């Protein structure tokens, strides 16, 4: 026989549940921040390694549709993902991805490894990824290698901490964002899985769109 709760007791019970949920959420955020800080040096090294690759669009080759250096940058991040133990995929060297989690639905996190030409006027080596006064300098640090690699390490932190997620998370590495995003068009055209929802950690995310 069901027990009927009085309104006051029901309200109190709901309050207890919400308090517990908020507390667990806050604790998860704290653990996540601690884990990311713990991995900071490793993450910075990965950013440096990728920024050192001058992945400006080049002459297409049979296995490198956007040029050899763009493929090198893609291969580097796929290798990082494999070493972390993530599931990885490579769509004709145009889009790569790493994935974690279970479920029918997939959240897409779309970044890119290609960059615009180095240009002039740098105070520091654009491929050196130097840190001065708490700021990292290099082509792609902000657009979009740094944020993309940050997303990879955020996913690693979620996995390592065993935080609950109810759908798969896929971090995608585009290779032609700076020249029209034909890479994403190809991903869709060949029938790759589309996310249920997603976001792009590009440049000054989330302040610009």
Task: Name each model feature, range by range.
Residues 28-110, 115-118:
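N-terminal helical capping/dimerization or prosegment-like subdomains
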Residues 14-26:
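Short, Lys/Arg-enriched N-terminal segments with co-localized hydrophobic residues
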Residues 106-173, 179, 193:
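Active-site metal-coordination/substrate-binding segment of hydrolases
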Residues 166-209:
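Histidine/acidic-residue-rich, glycine-tolerant segments that coordinate divalent metal ions
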């Amino acid at each position: 026989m069901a027990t009927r709760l009085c309104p006051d007791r029901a309200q109190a019970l709901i309050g207890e549940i919400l308090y517990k949920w908020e507390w667990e959420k806050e604790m998860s955020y704290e653990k996540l921040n601690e884990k990311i800080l713990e991995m900071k040096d490793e993450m910075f090294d990965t950013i440096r390694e990728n920024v050192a690759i001058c992945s400006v669009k080049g002459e297409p080759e049979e296995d490198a549709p956007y040029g050899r250096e763009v493929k090198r940058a893609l291969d580097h991040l796929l290798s990082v993902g494999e070493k972390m133990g993530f599931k990885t995929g490579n769509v004709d060297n145009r889009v790569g991805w790493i994935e974690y989690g279970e479920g029918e639905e997939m959240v897409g996190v779309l970044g890119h490894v290609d960059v615009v030409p180095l240009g002039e006027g740098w105070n520091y080596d654009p491929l050196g990824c130097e840190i001065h006064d708490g700021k990292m300098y290099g082509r792609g640090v902000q657009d979009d290698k740094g944020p993309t690699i940050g997303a990879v390490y955020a996913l690693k932190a979620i996995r390592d901490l065993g935080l609950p997620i109810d759908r798969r998370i896929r971090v995608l590495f585009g290779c032609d964002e700076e020249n029209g995003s034909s890479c994403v068009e190809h991903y869709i055209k060949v029938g790759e899985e589309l996310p249920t929802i997603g976001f792009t950690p590009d440049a000054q995310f989330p302040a610009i769109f």
